Every structure is written in C-alpha cells, then in structure tokens.
Regions:
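Short linear motifs at secondary-structure transitions and domain/linker junctions
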Residues: 72-76, 98-100, 135-141
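Core dinuclear metal-dependent hydrolase active-site scaffold
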Residues: 1-27, 33-93, 105-109, 143-164
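Proline-aspartate-enriched helix->loop->beta-strand connector
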Residues: 95-100, 107-127
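Short beta->alpha linker loops
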Residues: 60, 127-128
Length: 164
C-alpha cells in the first residue's frame, strides 16, 4: 500500500486492486487501470469495491471512514471538529494508520485521539501540523509518500509522518 498527500484534506491510497482518494466528507474508490466507474462514498455504512472495504461511521457533524485493504486499516477522520465519542472510539479498533485533521480538531485533541487509537502511523493534515508535531515527543519523519505493508509496521512507537 502506498499513501500520498494531495493537499488540504486529500489523500491517495494505492493498493494492488484499486486507488482510494479522500476529500473532506467523501471517499472514492477507482478501479486499478482506470477501467470501470469510480465509486464515491459520502455516508455511514459498509462498502466493498475491488477488494477494498470502507466502513463509514457517523461522528458529530461528519462521517469518519476506515479503509481496509491488504490487511491494513487506515482511519480517515475528514474534518471532524470534536473528539469522537467513547462509543465511536471503541468501534474504531485495530487501526494501523490514522489521518487526523489538526486544524478543525486542534493539535491537543488530535493528540488525544491518537493516544486512544494507538496506531502505527499518524498522518496529520492541515495548516497547524508544526504545532501537532511539536507536541509529539518522538518527532516526525518527512516523506513524499508512505509505502507500507503489515510486515513493515513499526514495532515500538507510533510514527508521525509529514508529507512534503
């Protein structure tokens, strides 16, 4: 799986079977090779296209999405502005990567979400990334894209990834 950042709230997740793009309140799955129509998800529910599963959960004023492919689970928090409820946090288990908004949610609250979910990777996005990174004791790593698999997940500490 390869994850790259396209600016604002937009990520691109390339898998062996398809390409997932995110944009604030939506997740779109495109078929590998551009064959077939794109499938856009804008509401809570369970979806599967091209071997990619997407689980949408209602959060206050937004929908958050788990994108599951290649034995990895990526949580995309969109533009949530409040801490997810404890009930929702318990549903968001076994997250490998979390993309978290540091503007609408705030750096402190984003850190609290990360602490509750304990992912392997954190992908902060927004204008206040530096403030979030400064509050994280282990620093960050800057990359153009993140290539990962279940076998390459870090063992000891959650890594904060900042995209160029």
């Amino acid at each position: 799986m390869d994850i790259s950042y396209s600016g604002k709230t937009n990520f691109k997740i390339k898998t062996k079977t398809g390409i997932v793009t995110t944009d604030a309140g939506a997740v779109t799955i495109a078929h590998k090779g551009g064959v077939g129509e794109d499938f856009t998800i804008t509401a809570p529910g369970e979806y599967e296209v091209e071997g990619i599963s997407v689980f949408g959960y209602a959060a206050e004023e937004a929908t958050v999405y788990i994108i599951q492919a290649e034995d990895l689970r990526v949580l995309y928090l969109g533009e949530i502005a409040k801490m997810p409820s404890e009930k929702l946090v318990t549903e968001l288990e076994n997250i490998d990567v979390v993309a978290v908004p540091v503007d609408t949610l705030g750096a402190k609250e984003a850190g609290e979400v990360v602490a509750k979910l304990e992912p392997y990777y954190v992908l902060p996005y927004g204008e206040n990334i530096a403030k979030f990174v400064a509050s994280y004791e282990h620093g960050s790593r800057t990359v153009k894209s993140l290539s990962l698999s279940k076998l390459t997940l870090p063992e000891d500490v959650t890594e904060v990834i900042v995209f160029e």
